[in-house]
């Protein structure tokens, strides 16, 4: 079974975000082993880089505004290809200050959800839902319409 790691900097303060992430992690557990690695915020993105890089396993996808934008279907295809080749996946979300260039350059892939900026806590929910959606698309579910 594929492993999905959500490597995230900082803690979620709002319970409704925590509950939403937990719900999608639970749903994802049908398809993959899910681990959320919450790392402490540093003074700046560079101060967080070493710990982020140590926490990443397998194919690393960093969320970055300059990354490639994918449709849900294309993300599903990418996830299927990674699963077919036996690769675990680490998704990285930085703190409110973003990710260091070192982390972005070390990533296998940079993914962007939008040119807009979102709160990093909300991005955890959006990312968890989109990863779940990718698995549901690959399973042929009607979840994605």
Please provide the spans of the model-predicted regions.
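N-terminal beta1-alpha1 ligand-phosphate binding loop
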Residues: 1-24
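A short, Lys/Arg-enriched amphipathic alpha-helix followed by its capping loop at the start of a domain
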Residues: 23-31
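Structured adenosyl-cofactor binding patch, chiefly the S-adenosyl-L-methionine
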Residues: 101-145
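S-adenosyl-L-methionine/SAH cofactor-binding core of RNA-modifying enzymes
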Residues: 31-90
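Conserved RecA-like P-loop NTPase ATPase core
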Residues: 6, 61, 94, 127
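Short hydrophobic segments within beta-strands
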Residues: 7-9, 37, 92
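Short glycine-rich anion-binding loops that position phosphate/pyrophosphate groups of nucleotides
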Residues: 12, 65-68, 95-98
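Catalytic-core regions built around general acid/base machinery
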Residues: 24, 78-82, 106
């Amino acid at each position: 079974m594929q492993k999905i790691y959500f490597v995230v900097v900082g803690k979620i303060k709002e319970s409704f975000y925590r509950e939403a992430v937990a719900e999608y992690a639970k749903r994802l557990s049908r398809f993959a082993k899910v681990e959320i690695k919450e790392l402490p915020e540093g003074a700046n993105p560079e101060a967080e880089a070493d710990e982020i890089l140590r926490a990443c396993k397998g194919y690393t996808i960093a969320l970055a505004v300059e990354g490639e934008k994918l449709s849900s279907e294309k993300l599903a295809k990418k996830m299927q290809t990674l699963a077919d080749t036996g690769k675990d996946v680490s998704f990285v979300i930085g703190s409110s200050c973003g990710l260091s260039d070192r982390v972005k350059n070390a990533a296998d892939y940079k993914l962007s959800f939008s040119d807009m900026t979102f709160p990093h806590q909300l991005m955890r929910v959006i990312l968890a839902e989109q990863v779940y959606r990718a698995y549901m698309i690959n399973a042929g579910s009607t979840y994605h319409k």
